[in-house]
Each structure stands twice: as structure tokens, then as C-alpha cells.
């Protein structure tokens, strides 16, 4: 640590200490990593920001040409050009370019070999105002073509030699070859004939060039740089580098790299000479070319600079190095001969962002000073957080040199070009923050700790690799190696996968610079080291172990004759990895022997491990103490075996120990003898949780198992696998139960039964049952007596039948056995039955080996039992695995192979195919066969499904966990994980397979999370876990490993061979396709079990042929690219196209054509109409979606819209001049349909109405169309009923939904004759009926606060309204709501008050006061009411929010008597001009549907715009009381006949009844078609109650709008129409989940017409329930409506809303509240209950989530029971 850094850290320490002394409770998380002093220093380095230069570089070149026209500007191999000539030629060419095309945003590719004409072409394009893209003809044609296609080239400049290539890569472009003869004969005469015009000035904001770099997808990324961005960096950069008028600058860099732009433009702008050698000399005789051209300044990579002759360096004024890290030894060596400059800069921020113009000034290399920019270092995972000085962070560049982003790639641009990170806006104590655009480089850098602010390069983020779980920075290794080796040594560290399999290995490739000696004349890439160099390597290795962790020390040093280089002259790391793949483990040992000092194993542990290595790896025990396990041929499987072998010798090792300490000596230090603690048993009941004591656990589990408590030996949690298997057993009852029969001699069978009895005593897993403990989940219960023996008999068939009918589920035995005597025979049938929850393919042989030992009188003692594995699982932090899988599966494609025939289809394997893939040993010895199979299958799936993102499941042994003796544990540990593979056909096969291997290794610590838990992590995880293909790899065991004797009777229950074991695994197939591969020495057998409805047998046969072909291609051509082998023959291609989902467009990376023609392209590609644009804007706002996520082809229903959202849409649309109805919204098939929306006697009338309210032409409505097919929903039906009644047709909402066609609806409609007498339901006082005289205005008037108020109407309050009145008058006043309307800008206070009073005048419920007369609560409507309106000033210096809330608290505590106004306004004015209007209202006057209308009215009244009209609430009351309730009583009587209220009441006592809630969101994006979102929570809740309470008939409450009862204009009623109504679900045994959804939806539709009755009215009039006992629902489902958060108030005034309920509502029931999220893609569920029951609620919410999963496509067709 430097002195400067130490002072900073000391200050930081003092600051932290001072804070903690003042506040010992100060959270550690609140401390910043960067101290205030450090932050000031960082800002001082970056302030002021260097200015933007607003001119173009070609202007500077023109100035030089005017001053020195005869001076040589370009001295090239193909001729020279003066400044006057380049000015003249570029002017003429620029004019020609403008004549050909003067449109804006032109991009012109430039394709030249090294030539004097390249600079002319570039200057001409600059002057013409176009943008250039430089290309190198040495690059592959495919890449050139990709670039040309991206820029949409219309004009293409090339040299004469490259014109043919240009025409090939750009066949549609105009090719203009450039040469001297072209200028003389064509360009000059042509421009002379044109009018004499001058070139217009070019804006500095115009794009100057596009620099293409490699893209991660294989498609080049084009970064756009403008003139000013380039100039702002080039001018200060050139001054620092050393461009002078006398300079002769080498034009070395390939035209594919942006350094060549600096070489051209900086040279010419400074009046220097550009020296351009031919490509041939540039690559093969650089020193000679520089010598001949008298070069004084050159820029190149350090790798190239090392090849220069010494005299060249002596004659250079400066050499600029970049593109790679510069070693201090190189800098010191070259610095003695010339000035060494180090440059750094990504293409995205022009050519160079920093320049170190004196690299020899320090004993280490820095990147130098900022040029045209500011530099920041942030945490690599969070660009908002700066890192301290000296710490490594990601480099961020800010300033005028930051480019515009990537061409046609907004997502990548957004990812790395960021705006206003938090640290930039925040600033520091001495420097104010600022806005800025920043580029994230991905480079890891640290600031020089000496305090001058210069950065030091560490490496690339993506050059960080992981080896055996440890992150390794290759650059750090190289840096530390270079320090201890001769300065001219070339080296590169890499992680390779040696030939012959095994783990990845860290090695170093080195080139020793020998002055004499033979070159590699034989073509061998490998070199040799001199004795002196070997000695240096040995010394270096010792120092590496001091400087670095052991896992960062290379396992071998590979000598090369020559370091492979890319065209950019950087080290070719891909080639190094290829060389590494050709090296065997024996080669590595040979390379190492030359430099390693063989250290004999001396310690006792080293000697023990030496023999264990020999046992596991084979061969003699001659390993030295510094030998590396993985270099010697070890891999993960052998590591597992080493752990087991060590355990046999009483040595404790874990797989991670081996991975991280691979040398014999390091491993020996890590190994330790088995301790007493490790051999002790895990105490019984030690893993059940502290809140569940052993006695309670024993009693509860015994009750659930139906046994005595004394019989319970232990209880511990289930594994995720067991949980999943038990859950799946409910779905596929027999799928995970195996029944096996062995026919044996009677004596043998009886002895075998005794052996089983003995083995069961010593094998707890066989005595294990699984139970579901309420509120706790699934647990394993180990019984002392498992009660496993079944009665004997003499009829085997009958025994097997009874055995199959005996369930294996919760609380029952999961393993059982019995004997059946064969009649008239000395044979007996021994039958065992076992559930997969207690065994797997690994543990089954262990169990039967246990039995065999007992059969032979031997005792078996397992070192570890299943509960040791459980202990390990419970010790893990699930958050780590959750984070891994969530990130791993982010963005997963929903398209998997094979596709299902239709949504909701339940797969059932019915076909089996076998195919043998022959793999010669010589071929697959270089690669892991398991990895090859995974990679090949991913490619096969991708080819067939037409998508590059593939997911399939793989079942693993699960025995990689660090549990001693895990290989001997009797119990199921297999685990299934989703394998995700993203393919790019540009990727080499070897690299692709290495990627797959790396992923499988990385997932090992997280493989036991469980599919059911992974799928809950996110929507993407759920998609990924809906697996269609399952893969099982059965490796062939070594003869000495895992061999089970076949001579004992228990082995008759084992599969006779690997093939039979594979077939056994196929019996448990629940996938559409399951592949079991049995791996052998010379190949593998594939057994495919599949559902022929998903893929035909013929097609599957061809799929296996494709798999075979790709495996062979992988083995035979590992250097090829995936695209070279990704080929289907015509028959295979037809299969693929036939089964490919129609919404999949084949990824361009897969090289396939689109599945459908252009006509299938989404309408989102079309330009939106004005109406579509308006509607998309409204939908985005009310559904909470990004507008860009809403396509014209999306329907409101698909986007997650509901009736409330539809009403908001209609209201907002009308405000924008679009006349829509709610019914039209639901009817529309798409946004386009809705935007384009504009009928025989009764049918004709209805068609006319439908045409109007659904917005479609009458001619488009057919008699056979049903309302539901036309898109209707409850609100739309309500409008149809209302409008039909106005036309004299009487229909109900139920009739609308029940009618299958328009014709049927018309036939059910009754015509109302005008002569029929009608009751005036709008008459005042009519709702009081015969009691009107008892509650006259004169009588009621005495109860009013003001006797002068004029009464216009009186009505009886509705039941919920009455409760709300009581909740306003009495304490606690839970029905009072305070809406805070916040104005940030000044408002017209007088106008606001007028608007508030006018609001009351317009809405009768606001001028309604409530009185109590003879125990009847009445609503009294006043003709006029001036409600309280006050203004309060917030005192200066007061916290406004606290002051307002104190005022609200004071207000709610004040009396609110009957007869007074519940409505009041208080305007709080703030000293800064802001204000807050507090609006008080009672729930007796509103519900959540009408309140947004009220605020729209208030906004309109204030701004003077059109005010939306509302319907008086008293009209609704009249309609309900006089018309609807009489009709509703028979309906509710019929629905609730024979029912009773369902009670979900835990046994936990309630003490203070405080409310508590929990909330989770669930993915519902795959909900079934034609099922409304509102049906989902209701159906899910019904399922939860049914399952939890074991009921088939449930009744609970549901909150409804109360607006579907047929009243006219129901959507505009202002008042509390909402109701709680009963919902009943009488389950049928034959129901599927879809049947349930349809039943729920049908009941919603039917009951909508009768939803105005209150609960108390229904109980009293429609049921035989006890009114005293059933006063309220026990559980209620409520779908919450959307809410207004902000609203414009006109004249630039914006209002934000905040809601306060100072007094919480007393909780009376369980509430299940649903919230539609993300436009209907997610459903939020909140469970509200009492605090004491919140633990129970967590289980309830979990069950709701599981129920919702069953209601989604893919499962909805399954049977419930």
C-alpha cells in the first residue's frame, strides 16, 4: 500500500470510528466503500470535464493543404501524394458522392489493401457528409458481407484490386473503384461538367465512421462515432502521443481496427507524412519497411514490437503501444532506445481515451492521463457504486469522446451506454454532481495508489475464467510471471481441456527468445527451454506460490517456438486453447518434468494419498509431492472416488478440497483423519427446527402416519427430490412406484424374507414415511417398526392387484414386501414394492447388497446414513442456489423440443426406440462423452425447434456433495436440473463443448434446489422447468467400482444389465421424450421413450439418426464450427418444419428460413395508425406496460385487461376523442381491430346494438356468433342489456353469456310493449316502499346537523354502506379515507375551492348525510351542501408530510356524528409554493371503481374542460331494492341449497387479533384461452379450501362490483355499489382443472345479474344458515382494481395521489386479494389474516401458488382428483 493510499484509508477509518462512537447502532450497510476524502479526490481528477471540440478533422487537413500544398502527405508503396493532391482528389470525389446520393445517414464502406488512396477515400466521404466503414480485405467474406448488410450500403468505395470482392459482398451497391487513372479519366472530367458548387459544411454532430467489432452473437457490432466525438479525443491524444509536422508515421494497423484512423487523420491534420507499406512487407518484413521509409513514429501491439530489430527502435522518436498490456520489462528495455508511449481506448470511445507518454517513469505501467474524457471505476456488478482508490473496478468513460452506440442494436447500446449513474448525479462534498453519458468498457482497472489518478490495467472482465469454482484473472497470472522471467519472454496463461478427458487445467504457454538455434522446420508448434530458462521457471514458480493462491499457479509450462497472433497482432488465445486440446496429460507431465524439481512425498498423509492416487488414477504410486491431481488424469468422477477411497482409510477429504488443492502436498495439508465428531450420528429430531420440540413432532408425525408415538424414531425434512416425487405421485399415481417379483425356492424365499427383516432394521430409509405437517411442510418420519410385511397368500395375481391398490402416499409405507406361495409347487413369489421417494438407481444396489449380506449372515455397517445428507442440505443457504438458477434461466425461450400437439396437453409415453451410436475409443478419448451427448442433443433440439435457446432436463446422481461416505448412503439423491444451452453457429465445436462442460461443473453446488423450487423463482424459470425432454446418462462403471455380486438372491430384483436398468428408468417417464443413454467403451445405446402424439415414431427414428450424425461430426471435426454440422436432409427438414411451433421464426444464427412467409410477420412491424398510437399510449398507462411491449396484434384480453381496466380505457379514450364502449374493448381481437371499430326484427335490433357497442360493422356480425366469441365480458354484457332495454328488448346478463349464438339470444329476449305500465324507479323516496311515510323529510330532518338543509330524497342504506356509516361515526373510524392530492407547482386556490364545491354539487352521494331512525340507517340526499373547506399554511421549517399527517390525525379523532357531512377538504399550502389538498370521504359514499371518475371530474372542473357525467347512487339503490332483489332471491336459494359456510380456522388461539399479510406474485402468462383473469384467484382459492379441509363442497365470499344487475349506465354510477356475495364450488370427481375454471367463470356470469344483494340479506332470505352464527364470511376473495396515481390538472399542473386510512379496518375474515400485474402476465396474491395465523398463511399462499400452476396451460387438462 502506498503512503497516499494509507493516509486515505486512515482518514476513512477515523470517519467510520467517529460515526460508530456517535451512533453504535449505525447500520454497517449505510457506510459507503469510498470515503468522503477519496470521493473528493476522484472528482478532482475528473473535474472539469474536458470540453467538446466542435469541428471536423478534414477541416484541419484542408488548412494544412492550403499552407503546404507541395509537401508529401502520403509516402506509400504504390506512390506518393502531396497535401495539394489529397485535397484536390478528395474534393472531387466528395462532390461525386453527393451527386450520386446526398441523403442523410449515408454509410459508405471502404475496402482497400494498404494503399495511398485509402486516405483520399476517407477524406472524400468525410467532406461529403457521409459516414465511412473501413474494411480489411483479409477478413472472411462472410464477415464483410455481414457488415455491408448492416450498413445497407448503396455506394461502395474500393481499390481497383478489391472491386471484384466488393461486388461479391455488396451485389446491390454501386462499386466505385479508386485509382489515379479513374481520377484522370472519369472523376475529374465528370465533376468538371457539373455546376461549380462548393461542398456544404459538415455538422460536427454527423456520424464520422462506424467501427465494427466482434459481437457475442457472432454478428459484428458497429459502433457509431461522430466528428466531434472523434475530434474531442484525437486533438489532445495526438499532442500527447507526439504527432509533429516533421513526423513520418507508420501506417501499420489493419483497416479493420480503428487505430488506422488515427494514423491517417492525426498524421494529416498535423502536416506529417503517412508511411504506408504493402501488406506483404507489413506482415513479413516490418523492420525492413520501416527502415526504407525512414519511419520516426510507429504504433503497434507489444507482441509485434518484440519482433522489431534493435536499430529500428534506436531510430524512432516514439513508439506507441496499445491493444495489449505492456510489461514493465518491455517498457524498460525499449525505453532505453526510444520514447515509449502507452495508449488505451475502446472503439466505443474513439481510438484512445488515455495516454501514458512516459511509461518508464514508474516501476510499473499505468494507462496514463485522460484525453478528452473522465474516468470512473465502479463495482463490476453495479455501475452506480464507485470503488476505493487502489481497488479493482470496471472502467467507465465519460465525456465528449463517448460514441453514439451500436448500429441497429438498441438493446446492446442500452446495456453499455448508460445515462446519469447515481455517483455522477450525487457528486461529492466539494464537487457538485452532473448529468452525463457513460460507456462501460468491461475492462478491469485500478487507480494508481500514489494519488495521481492514473489508471492501471488489470484485465478484461470476460478474461476472468473459473477453474474448479474459483475465479481466475489470467492477466494477473501473466503479470506476476513476467516479473520473474527475462524481459523478452512471450507468455500467455490459459485454461485448457487436455486430450483424453479429465478436468480443465491452468497452463502457461511460453516462447523463450533464443538468439540462436533451429526454428520449427518440421512444423511442430512446440519448442524447448534452455537450462538457464528452466532454472528461471523454477525460481518463478516458487515466487508464484508466494504471490498467488495455489489454484492460480499454472500446472504446466508449455514451450512454443512462436506465439500465435491474430490479424490485430494480439495473442490468438483461441489457437492456444486448440493447442492445449491436443496436449495429453502425459505431455503435461513431460513438459513439467523439464522445469519441476521432483519433490518426494515425505509426510505420512502425503504417502497415504500417494497410494490412493494410484488406486484412483491407475499406474504406480510414483507421484511427487508437487504433482497435480488433474494434470495426472483426474477429473470430477475420480475426485469423488478419491473421497470415498480416502474415507475407507479414515481420511476426510471433500471434492472441493481436491478441486482447490490439486497438488499432492496441498491436498495432504487439507486432508485430516476422521474425527469422532464426524463419525457421530446426527441426533434424532435435531433438524426439525427450534420452534417444534421433539415430543410434539413425535406426536404429530405419529398421528399423520397412524402409528403410536413410541414408534417414531426420528423426523427430518424431505429433500426437494422427495417433495417433487410425492407431488408428482398425486398427478401420475403409479408413475413412481416399482413393483418387482422374484420366483425363488421356498426355503430361499423364507431366508430372504428374514434377510430383508434384518436389513430393514439397519436401513432407516426403508422404514421412512413422508407426511405433510400443517404449517411446516413435508417431513420424513423414520419408524422403529416400519410395518412393511404384507400378508401372505397363494394367489400371486390377487396379491399384486391388492398391492397396486394400496396407495403409497402421505403417511403410508413407501417400501413393503411379501411372500406368495405358488400352489402345488415348492416355489414362492417374493414381491417388493417401493416408491422412488426412498430409492434411486445408485442406492438400490446398496440396499440389496445390505440384504445379501444379511442373507449370508454378515453384518453391514454404512459409515453414513441418509440423514447426514439431509443435514448437509439444511446447512446450505438456498439464496445462493436461487440466485444461480434465476440468473442462469433468465430470458429462457418458451419453445422446447418436442412441441406439444396443443396447449394443456398431458404427455404420456407410448413408444420406445433404441439406437446404438458407435464411438471409437480413439475419437472420444479427447472429449468427455457426456459433454458431447449434451451438446449434440442441444443442437439437434435447436435444429428441429428452430430456436437457438434450448432447455432440456437432465437427471444427475446428486452425489457430488461434500458429505463423507456419500457414495455409501442408502437413499435417493438423484436430482433433475434444467440444462440450458444457447447456440451460435459461428462458435467452434471445441469451444461450444467446453462451454457446456463449464456450465455443468458450475451448477454442481446448486443441483439439489429441486425443479419445483427452481420453477418458482421467476417467469423464465417456470418456462424453463416445463421440460419436454429428459436426459439420463448411465456411465459404464469401472470393474472395480460399484460392482455388485450377482450370486445372491436379492440381486434378482436388480436390473440384469445397464440396458435393463435404463429401461427401468424409462418406466418413470413423464416427459414427452426421455432419452436414456448407456455409455460404453465404444459408444452408447440411446433408448428413447416418447409420446407419439408429440413426435411420430418415423420422425423420432430420424431424430436419432441426426443425433448419431452430429456426435460423429463433433468427434471427427472438433475444429469446425457448429454451423458446419448443423444440417438436416430434406426428410428431416420436413419433420422439423411440421413440428415447429408456428410462432417461431428460426433464428438467423441457425441458418434456417422463416417458418412462415412474410404474411405471418407480426403486425407490429407496420406503422401504427393515429388511433392505434393513442390506444397504445392509454393501454400502456392503465395496464402498467411499456408501450413498446404492446403490439397492434395484441388484444386487450391477452394483455391482461379486466372490466375495470376496460372502463378506464373507455373513459381515457373518450377524453382523447375516441368513441369506444366497454363491450367493444372486450370484443376486439386486437389493438388494430379496436382502433378500426366503428344488424331481422329482434335479431336485427340486437345486431344493431352489437354493431354499436362492439364497434364492428353490422354486416360482420353473423347469427351464429356468440357474445363471448365476439369478445364480451361482464361489463360488455351489462352495456348490451342496458342498450337493449332502451330498444324495448328485455334480456339479462346471464342470457347474454349463456346464449350460444345471436339467434339464440334474440329468441330468448322479450319485447317490452310501450303500453306496459312501468314503475318509475327514479322517483324519490321510492326505495323506502311502504315505510316512506314513517321516514318523512319532516321526521328525518330533525336528525340533521343543519335544520336549514333541504332534503330531496331518502333511501335505506345498503348493507355494506350501513357498515361503512358505522365505521365512520364510531371509533375506530376505519371507513374514513383521506386522499392526499399533491401539487408540486403553484395552483389557483380560489379555482380549486370552486372545483371542490362544484364536485359535491354534481354528485348526490357527496351531498348525502346519514341518519339513524328507529335503528334503520338512512341516506339523506340534500339539494345543496357546502362541505367544509379550509386552508392551512405549513409553518416555515416544518416537515410538510408530518404536519399534514398530524392534522389528519386530529381530524379523524374529532366526532363525526350522524346527520353531518362526511366529506371535507383541507388545502395545506407549503412555503415553496407547493400544496396538498386533503380530501376526506367515507366508504359509505364511494367504491374503488367510481373514485377515479371523481378525480377526473375534479381535474376537469379545475381546468375548465368537459366534465364526465355520473349516475346518482339513489337510482342504483332504487333499481336494486325494487327490481333486482326480488329476482335474486330464487337464484341464491337455488345456488346455496344444502350448503354451509366453509371455515378455515387454525387451532392457534388468537390473543389480540392484529392483522398481518404476506404477498407473492405468480406468473399467469400461460392462462388458458377464453378464461378471464378474475376466474383464476377464485378457482385457486376453491382448490386450496378443498384440499386443505378435505372438502368437495366449499363456500366462501367474493367481492364484486355490484354493477351488473341491469341498471342503465351502470359504469357511471357514483357510489358504493360493491358487495360481498357467496361463491360456491361443489366439486365433481370427474372435473379437470379446466372444468373448474369454466364452472367458476359460468357462476361469475350467472351471479352477476344478482350480485346486488348483501350478505346479510342472502343469509336471511335465501339460506337455512344460523344468522347468529353466520354473520360474515370466513374467507373472502377480492380482485383489487387499478388505482389513479397521478392526473393532469390542466395548465401544466400535475397532481400525484396518496391514500391514507389512519384507522385500520378490524379484520373479520381471511382475505385473498388478487392484483393484476404487468399487463396480465402476473397475478399478485396477498393473504391477510391475524398475526397469530401468519405462519399458517404462508402455507396457504404456497398452496394458492401451486393451485394457480395447475390452472395454467400444460396442466389445466389434468384431472383434479
From Swiss-Prot:
Residues 712-1135 are annotated as: Condensation 1. The keyword Phosphoprotein applies. Pathway: Siderophore biosynthesis. InterPro entries: ACP-like_sf, AMP-bd_C_sf, AMP-binding_CS, AMP-dep_synth/lig_dom, ANL_N_sf, CAT-like_dom_sf, Condensatn, PKS_PP-bd. Residues 600-675, 1169-1242, 1237-1313 form the Carrier domain. GO terms for molecular function: ligase activity; phosphopantetheine binding. Disruption phenotype: Leads to increased sensitivity to oxidative stress and reduces the virulence toward rice plants. The keyword rRNA-binding does not apply. Coiled coil: none annotated. One of its GO terms (cellular component) is cytoplasm. The modification O-(pantetheine 4'-phosphoryl)serine is found at residues 636, 1203, 1274. Gene3D superfamilies: 3.30.300.30, ACP-like, Chloramphenicol acetyltransferase-like domain, N-terminal domain of ligase-like, Nonribosomal peptide synthetase, condensation domain. NRPS involved in extracellular coprogen-type siderophores biosynthesis including coprogen, neocoprogen I and neocoprogen II. The role of extracellular siderophores in fungal virulence to plants is to supply iron to the fungus during plant infection, but not to act as phytotoxins, depriving their hosts of iron. Belongs to the NRP synthetase family. This is Nonribosomal peptide synthetase 6. It comes from Cochliobolus miyabeanus (Brown spot disease fungus). The lineage of its organism: Eukaryota, Fungi, Dikarya, Ascomycota, Pezizomycotina.
